[in-house]
Amino acid sequence: MLRPDESVTTSVPMNISKRVDAAVIVVVPLFVTFLMIVGGTPGKLGAFALVGLAVGAYIGLRHPTYLTRALAFSLGALPFGYVPGVHAPLVFTLGFGVVLASVIHRTGVSRVTYGEMAVIALIVTSALSVVATGSATVDYAEFGKWLVSTLVAVSLLRLPRTELELFGRIYVYAASLAAAFAVVVLMGDPAGKLIGYLSPFGYGTEEESTRFVYSGGAATVRLAGTYIDPNAAGIGLFVALMLCVLLLRDRMRLALSALLFGALVLTLSRAALFSVVFGVVLMLLFQSMRTRDRVVIIGGFFAAFVAALSVPTVRSRVFSSFGSGDAGSSARGDALADFPGHMAGHWLFGLGWGRTEFKDPGSAFEVNYVANAPLLSVYRGGILAGLAFSAVIVVGAIIGYRCLRSKHWEHGFIGGGFIGFCVVALQLDFPVVTIPATTMAFSVLIVFLVVAWEKATDNVPDDRTRRPFASQSPVATNMA
């Protein structure tokens, strides 16, 4: 009961979180309105940036798992998109938020795996190289984008496995959406005009976004879609295919894996296609499985490969790899021959991170640097970074082999796929090293290789007693 001199309201001190929320609610709208009225175009852009920063900060502090889910969708569907209204790469912005959230908030998993140790060693050696060779802002900017894309692997492995598997499924669905869109563009809009509808995300700004492969004097359009570069598309779709088989089941897995494999074939990326083939061969050689499952898998992939080769452009692309007239093979041979000369005097820390040939196709053609991920890591960051990158490959291959010995073929598929990717794609192409979005896709592949290993060895971490990225809830105040 209230005494006669008491009020029906009681003042409760506002905690810091609520004070910050109140300040944002009051200050941000006033400042945004001021910029919109008096700032002109720069002011409007600044206003949009401020709103985005405020919203992103709020989500990161109060609902950080939304960041991981948004990152999964963006990396799968819009890997080269930009934040609307702000010229900032979408996956880099979200990736930075995910990394920061994993530092600020309590994580779901505390243990560190061997795969993460190898990634951390790569980060340390790469940091040494940029400190030794960095001479301009672009060097540190490129290193920063690579760093965020690589740290995502460590941050995602801090998540509870249920949340991490949700991340993987979102990535698969988003990549499948991007694959379907790319197929529509390839079949019905070879000029690539449909991609202009994604202009709010920075797509469609190039005068000519279509990519070709030339064979026998004829030009064939390659599938790229929102991945822009067909080789980057091949890698992104390869990762999605691995996750699709690992995480999905039944008809959904069958339908989306067929879509992803078909789109991967249409990229005409030999590195990605041969990685799948190599991985399946390893799975069939080392995986213990029932005869029925083995027959179904052999029949399914044989039918898929025959269907792919029935397309003349695909058949020509595949078999030209083994001929002496393949221009790509000749260029790779010349680049390997020139590699020691490029590295003379730069073996320890490399030639630098912000070099023109990494960003300008014309300069890349003139320099003709090695299209080999481990050697390109040496070219950019020196022998220490190259050895650390090779250590990531070796540790991943060991984990992959353990997955191959699992009783479940889904684990063997991603284990063999990772080994195949390292043996084929990383030796024939370089986007994993030079393109941040593709670097992040490789980080995701490493993450789910670890997840498959945990399941294959019954070593899944117990995260039920820990809340990931959990912000503290306000303490209830008892009022007498």
Where are these regions (language model features)?
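Alpha-helical transmembrane segments of multi-pass inner-membrane proteins
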Residues: A127-L128, G168-L268, F274-L285
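Interfacial loop-to-transmembrane-helix boundary motif in multi-pass membrane proteins
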Residues: L67-T68, R111-L122, S155-F201, H408
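N-terminal hydrophobic segments of proteins, predominantly signal-anchor/transmembrane helices
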Residues: Y58-L151, W409, I419-V424
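Helix-loop-helix junctions and helix-breaking kinks within/between transmembrane helices
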Residues: V38-K44, Y82-L90, S135-K145, I228-G234, ...
